[in-house]
UniProtKB/Swiss-Prot annotation:
Residue numbers of Asymmetric dimethylarginine PTMs: 424, 435
Keyword Phosphoprotein appears in the UniProt entry: yes
Functional summary from the UniProt entry: The TFIID basal transcription factor complex plays a major role in the initiation of RNA polymerase II (Pol II)-dependent transcription. TFIID recognizes and binds promoters with or without a TATA box via its subunit TBP, a TATA-box-binding protein, and promotes assembly of the pre-initiation complex (PIC). The TFIID complex consists of TBP and TBP-associated factors (TAFs), including TAF1, TAF2, TAF3, TAF4, TAF5, TAF6, TAF7, TAF8, TAF9, TAF10, TAF11, TAF12 and TAF13.
Name recorded for this polypeptide: Transcription initiation factor TFIID subunit 4
GO cellular component, one term: transcription factor TFTC complex
Compositionally biased region (Low complexity): 66-85, 132-150, 158-171, 191-204, 302-320, 331-341, 396-407, 1035-1047
Gene name for this UniProt entry: TAF4
Organism of origin: Homo sapiens
Length: 1085
């Protein structure tokens, strides 16, 4: 419990907790917590401390305190409703957690109120803590008061206060002042069993000292705070009537019944050691529901969900004045007859201390002696039904099993003979049978899904949709209705002895409640064969979607639609007696028999498959037959089998055969028929219900979620909870009568659980772990079902903390799918004993696969080429030429490889020659300007340009002279008809016309260039691949002009041409060709 306490403290003192989330959680908790113990016959003895704690009226808020309580506590003023309770300083004692671990200290800063402030009447004022207190409580707008324990104790340095009520509401007596009495006290709630829960789980603390850390119970789901007092402390019940005769109740329409007068115990009674009273105040603002009556429950402690509850103390033998809360002075108190009193108000509380088994909690009603409970608000989330928990021995740390969002617990007596007078002693535990759930408002859409004829869809406990035949569904319902009425233990609906409880809850807006969609369940009562006491079991129910109301008790409607969930609770499951071991041993034997059958049939199939000879197959069959008939034993069988099949010995085979052969010989009387059946067809898969056993152990660690508004599920588990999810509806069975239900082999530790994939509608907070121990229900018959195909509907939002769950679910689903495909069917245990049948049969799988893959087995080991060899030269002319040359040397025949070799040699020679010629030709394009090692000595190109310019100038000068002569001749006015003169004139006119035409052409060109725009010159600063010594190869081709927008400008590709001079240069430099005939022929060309 120490580890769980630390985890709870970590959640509670996390500074990142959103105030609104916590407020909503408290609102949801209070709507689901009802005043427990209001429907018992007896009141346990009350102490003055209890009366003082209950006398202080607390408003609608829970005040949180530091785990190390305040050092000094001022005395509580006497409450108005309890005149006889004198205030006394609290007892000093060292605070320690319930499990004995170190408690994490809280921050010294003032805490925020954990409940939203609502309009509530100021019932009392909160006194600030005195000097030296470790943590201060922040006042809340609604009235709140905490009363200190009245037992005196010597002062100690910085020790927490004694047990004080976390929150208590007490209505005053029928005096003139109808308001609750002011009970000022130190501002630090403390109690020995107070536990911090923030998330809808139930916590059970065991206190070895009189004082424990003061903590708050904040919950969004139904939960109960069950503190276990010191073993020597007598049981105490505090049941305060909520606002009996209050001045201004927050529920507007519900009137307050008058307070019930009850004689109070004398104030001088010596106070026994204080137990752990804890009270939860409910914030106002939720409407009241229809009133119903509450059943009387024989177990010693109970906490029920619900809305407002009204309770008044029963009359005790002692005489006294009227008090709002009165206790009974002695342990042997008389029983109070229940009477129907109804009060429908929103505020409610749970004040409960779990006593030793010798005393019984009871509750009293507001109208004189009344034991009735009205629990009415509507529900908008998931509502788990109460789960019964037998109390462990005092002094042992115990954890409560965690439900969907936390379970309201009922402490059922495991020793019914120890009940006091007036309580009917019965061995039958309380049977809670919920009604059928109403369909949710938002049904799940399943698109493109065709249901086979005769099948129906039901929703399982995990939120999955399962396909079940209609006949099976009808059998489930008929079986559920056909159970005997004595096993149902129905409670009469009349409010005389055991009125039913109607439980509803209101979810605050924005409160995240983890909704699991399941169908209602019934209870499997399991009887311990080695013990006389009945192990009480209860149902863990999660309602689907939005379910308005759920009736517990009354006429139990056991006909259901889907799978039933039975949660085995109570003491750790190691106490389940010897039937478990025998059943599990039988199951293991059957599993071994099945695997041995598969092994032998596979052996026969492999031997007779054609790979082996017929003689080997016959010998293997004879060996198997002799083994089944008992003629030979396992050692002889395996040795002869190894010799027959030439296989390596298997060390696990002999022990496996020894374990499974006796049962196999009993189940297989006819060995010849078994061998024949193995040869004909593979063994049919055994029909198994794959959803029979789902071990879902709720993790004890705190699952932290990423978002602030996501709800978390935490609980401190001591015994693991095994949830037996069954594909059939299981009715309530008789005690001692085995319940018909489908049983699978329990998963051994370390094996893979193969349940259907867990699909949750909210953040998946359930961790799949291996159970520490196994529960087997002995069954006279087994219902064989076809494997149900789960249809997952909601894809869970996987958070960082749930990757392991997703991985386990995926692996389980894949393994289950593979197992169902196998001919022998899937088992829940790894086949580690015998898993290599092929090697035992002498089949080498690697050789077989190699033979299958090798299409041409004759080519194995030879050189294979991926492509056909192609010759460079034509085969026929080359062969003819080679034969012509060979005739001179006496060669008449030629191998085809010779032609190929000569062709390849020719190709290689030409390739080398072309490479050399290319290198030679590239040297002509080598630019020495770019090399820094060279300087330009002469510019031949510039000299040539200069000579060209000289020639051009000379020609221009001659043209000018001729033109000048022509112009002079044209201008002459001589009248002589000289033919030479006429010729010159004509030539001058043509020259002028030609000049005019040239001028027009030049003007037109300039105009066109101006219209086109300036030319973009190529940049030469970044040389491309074609510049320099490159460009001769045929592979690199770069376009001559560069694009306009390209960032890199390429220069024009320079093409290197290889000419005959380059070839001659190469032939001259080679030794082989420097004096060859080919070189001289090249010179001649």
């Amino acid at each position: 419990m120490a580890a769980g306490s630390d985890l709870l403290d970590e959640v509670f003192f996390n500074s990142e907790v959103d105030e609104k989330v916590v407020s909503d959680l408290v609102g949801s908790l209070e709507s689901q917590l009802a005043a427990s113990a209001a429907h018992h016959h007896h009141l346990a003895p009350r102490t003055p401390e209890v009366r003082a704690a209950a006398a202080g009226a607390l408003g609608n808020h829970v005040v949180s305190g530091s785990p190390a309580g305040a050092a000094g506590a001022g005395p509580a003023a006497p409450a108005e409703g309890a005149p006889g309770a004198a205030p006394e300083p609290p007892p000093a004692g060292r605070a320690r957690p319930g499990g004995g671990g170190p408690q994490r200290p809280g921050p010294p800063s003032p805490r925020r109120p954990l409940v939203p402030a609502g309009p509530a009447p100021p019932a009392a004022k909160l006194r600030p803590p005195p000097e030296g207190s470790a943590g201060s409580c922040a006042p809340v707008p609604a009235a709140a008061a905490v009363a200190a324990g009245p037992e005196p104790a010597p002062a100690g340095p910085a020790k927490p206060a004694g047990p004080a009520a976390l929150a208590a509401r007490a209505g005053p007596g029928p005096g003139p002042g109808p308001g609750p009495g002011p009970g000022p006290g130190p501002g630090k709630p403390a109690g020995p069993g107070a536990a911090q829960t923030l998330n809808g789980s139930a916590a059970l603390l065991n206190s070895h000292h009189a004082a424990a850390p003061a903590v708050s119970l904040v919950n969004n789901g139904p939960a109960a705070l069950l503190p276990l007092p010191k073993p020597a402390a007598p049981g105490t019940v505090i049941q305060t009537p909520p606002f009996v005769g209050a001045a201004a109740p927050p529920a507007p329409a519900a009137p307050s019944p008058p307070a019930a007068p009850a004689p109070a115990a004398p104030a001088a009674a010596p106070p026994p050691p204080p137990p752990a009273p804890a009270t939860l105040a409910r914030p106002p603002g939720h409407p009241a529901g229809p009133p119903t009556a509450a059943p009387a429950v024989p177990p010693p402690a109970a906490a029920q969900n619900g809305g407002s509850a009204g309770a008044a103390p029963a009359p005790a033998p002692a005489a006294g004045g009227p008090a709002g809360v009165s206790g009974q002075p002695g342990p042997g108190a008389a029983a109070a007859a229940p009477a129907p009193g109804v009060k429908a108000e929103s505020p409610k509380r749970v004040v409960q201390a779990a006593p030793p088994a010798a005393q019984t909690l009871a509750a009293s009603g507001p109208a004189s002696t009344a034991a009735s409970m009205v629990i009415g608000p509507t529900m908008q989330g998931a509502l788990p039904s109460p789960a019964a928990v037998p109390p462990p021995a005092p002094g042992t740390p115990t954890g409560l099993p965690k439900g969907a969002a936390g379970a309201v617990t009922q402490s059922l007596s495991r020793t019914p003979t120890a009940t006091t007078s007036g309580i009917r002693a019965t061995l039958t535990p309380t049977v809670l049978a919920p009604r059928l759930p109403q369909p949710p408002q938002n049904p799940t859409n399943i698109q493109n899904f065709q249901l086979p004829p005769g099948m129906v869809l039901v929703r399982s406990e995990n939120g999955q949709l399962l396909m079940i035949p209609q006949q099976a569904l009808a059998q489930m319902q008929a079986q559920a209705h056909a159970q005997p009425q004595t096993t149902m233990a129905p409670r009469p609906a009349t409010p005389t002895s055991a009125p039913p409880v109607q439980i509803s809850t209101v979810q605050a807006p924005g409160t995240p409640i983890i909704a699991r969609q399941v169908t209602p369940t019934t209870i499997i009562k399991q009887v311990s064969q080695a013990q006389t006491t009945v192990q009480p079991s209860a149902t863990l129910q999660r309602s689907p979607g939005v379910q308005p109301q759920l009736v517990l008790g009354g006429a139990a409607q056991t006909a259901s639609l889907g799978t039933a969930t039975a949660v085995q609770t109570g003491t750790p499951q190691r106490t389940v007696p010897g039937a478990t071991t025998t059943s599990s041993a039988a199951t293991e034997t059957m599993e071994n028999v099945k695997k041995c059958k598969n092994f032998l049939s596979t052996l026969i199939k492999l031997a007779s498959s054609g790979k082996q000879s017929t003689e080997t197959a016959a010998n293997v069959k004879e060996l198997v037959q002799n083994l089944l008939d008992g003629k030979i034993e396992a050692e002889d069988f395996t040795s002869r089998l190894y010799r027959e099949l030439n296989s390596s010995p298997q060390p696990y085979l002999v022990p496996f055969l020894k374990r499974s052969l006796p049962a196999l010989r009993q189940l297989t009387p006819d060995s010849a028929a078994f061998i024949q059946q193995s040869q004909q067809q593979p063994p049919p898969p055994t029909s198994q219900a794959t959803t029979a056993l789902t071990a879902v152990v709720l993790s004890s660690s705190v699952q932290r979620t990423a978002g602030k508004t996501a709800a978390t599920v935490t609980s401190a588990l001591q015994p693991p909870v095994l949830s037996l999810t069954q594909p059939t509806q299981v009715g309530v069975g008789k005690q001692g009568q085995p319940t018909p239900l489908v049983i699978q082999q329990p998963p051994k530790p370390g094996a893979l659980i193969r349940p259907p994939q867990v699909t949750l509608t909210q953040t998946p907070m359930v961790a799949l772990r291996q159970p520490h121990n196994r529960i087997m229900l002995t069954t006279p018959q087994q219902i064989q079902l076809n494997p149900l195909q789960p249809v997952p509907v909601v894809k869970p939002a996987v958070l960082p903390g749930t990757k392991a769950l997703s991985a386990v679910s995926a692996q389980a689903a894949a393994a289950q799918k593979n197992k169902l495909k196998e001919p022998g069917g899937g088992s829940f245990r790894d086949d580690d004993d015998i898993n290599d049948v092929a090697s035992m049969a002498g089949v080498n799988l690697s050789e077989e696969s190699a033979r299958i893959l090798a299409t041409n087995s004759e080519l194995v080991g030879t050189l294979t080429r991926s492509c056909k060899d192609e010759t460079f030269l034509l085969q026929a002319p080359l062969q003819r030429r080679i034969l012509e040359i060979g005739k001179k040397h006496g060669i008449t025949e030629l191998h085809p490889d010779v032609v190929s070799y000569v062709s390849h040699a020719t190709q290689q020679r030409l390739q080398n020659l072309v490479e050399k010629i290319s290198e030679t030709a590239q040297q002509k394009n080598f630019s020495y300007k770019d090399d820094d090692r060279y300087e330009q000595a002469s510019d031949v190109r510039a000299q040539l340009k200069f000579f060209e310019q000289l020639d051009q100038i000379e020609k221009q000068r001659k043209d000018e002279q001729e033109r000048e002569i022509l112009m002079r001749a044209a201008k002459s006015r001589s009248r002589q008809e000289d033919p030479e003169q006429l010729r010159l004139k004509q030539k001058a006119k043509e020259m002028q016309q030609q000049e005019l035409a040239q001028m027009r052409q030049r003007d037109a060109n300039l105009t066109a260039l101006a219209a086109i725009g300036p030319r973009k010159k190529r940049k030469v600063d970044c040389p491309g691949p074609g510049s320099g010594a490159e460009g001769s190869g045929p592979g690199s081709v770069v376009p001559g002009s560069s694009g306009v927008g390209t960032p890199r400008q390429f220069t024009r590709q320079r093409i290197t041409r290889v000419n005959l001079r380059d070839l001659i240069f190469c032939l001259e430099n080679e030794r082989e060709t420097s004096h060859s005939l080919l070189l001289y022929k090249a010179f001649l060309k």
